[in-house]
Regions:
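Short, surface-exposed basic-aromatic patches at helix termini and helix-loop junctions that form
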Residues: 40-43, 63-69
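Residues lining hydrophobic/aromatic ligand-binding pockets adjacent to catalytic sites
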Residues: 47, 200, 229
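Thiol-based oxidoreductase modules, predominantly thioredoxin-like and allied folds used
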Residues: 44-59, 71-79
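A short, polar/charged loop-to-alpha-helix boundary motif
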Residues: 219-241
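Short acidic, S/G/P-rich loop/turn micro-motifs used as interaction or catalytic elements
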Residues: 22-26, 57, 220-221
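N-terminal targeting signals for export/organelle localization
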Residues: 1, 236-248
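Short active-site neighborhood of thiol/selenol oxidoreductases, capturing the structured segment around
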Residues: 4-42, 48-52
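Thiol/selenol-based redox catalytic cores and closely related redox-interacting motifs
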Residues: 77-220
Length: 248
């Protein structure tokens, strides 16, 4: 990071600091997708968003092009220094003699994807396939789904799996598949150093005075929110805090 993280945050009533894993991680891409979905309800005067992800400048450029996340709000660092300072979960750290640091990281990542040292990951993976009546519809009927191994198709296809009032079966899994294809197709851009593949992130919401209103530390892969059905539900703290300030 070459500029202050909180630069130009002075006029915002709240500051949301997102410490992301690798920019090519499932969690980073999915978190950015949710933020873009809610962007109109999160004007900069209401909440200043700053994200720090593991990668390079090239990683950050590709990430923003793909997700639509604002480049001005994204900071990248190559070695997870902030993650270590905040004591965020570094992931499973099984070591086997004879393996390089990179190969150790890959082994631990695969084990975490299988649920070892990563509580809730398998449950969250299955939720993406079976649907979730507590989550909103994710793909609009007229949206064209591209970037997966499947031929392009319209979002209305998911009507076959259920009504539009909630997350239908395979809907979230499709978004995750699209993210996976994007990352694997540009692996060395997104992940210039595989030593930090298992590093997890965290979420921190502050008011304008610097008081911490909410925090979440990721316990594992696909654990970037306390409520994965509604990952941004914690932003209700902003409304509650605004009412409190108004009554003061």
């Amino acid at each position: 990071m070459t500029r202050p993280l909180l630069e130009n945050c002075e006029t915002a009533s709240h500051i949301l600091i997102l410490v992301w894993p690798q920019l090519g991680d499932f969690d980073s891409l999915e978190y950015a997708w949710w933020l873009q979905r809610k962007a109109k309800k999160l004007p900069p005067e209401k909440v200043a968003i700053r994200a720090v992800g593991i990668g390079s400048r090239t990683s950050g450029t590709r990430f923003c092009q793909y997700t639509g996340f604002s480049p001005e709000n994204l900071f990248v660092e190559p070695n997870a220094e902030l993650h270590h300072q905040l004591k965020l979960y570094s992931g499973l750290n099984l070591t086997l003699p004879g393996l390089s640091v990179s190969h150790q990281a890959w082994l631990n990542l695969m084990l975490m994807c299988a649920g070892f040292g990563s509580p809730g990951t398998l449950r969250e993976v299955f939720r993406g396939y079976r649907g979730d009546r507590q989550a909103p519809q994710l793909i609009e009927d007229d949206e064209i789904i591209q970037g997966t191994p499947l031929p392009a198709f319209k979002g209305s296809f998911f009507r076959l799996a259920g009504p539009n009032s909630f997350q239908r079966p395979f809907e979230l899994a499709t978004l995750r598949l699209r993210n996976m294809v994007e990352v694997l197709s540009n692996w060395h851009t997104y992940v210039p150093n595989s030593a930090y593949l298992t590093q997890r992130g965290g979420t921190f919401l502050f008011d304008s005075k610097g008081q911490l209103l909410y925090s979440h530390q990721d316990p594992g892969i696909l654990g970037f929110a306390a409520n994965m059905s509604q990952p941004l539900s914690f932003l209700s703290f902003i409304e509650a805090n605004s009412f409190t300030m108004g009554d003061a």
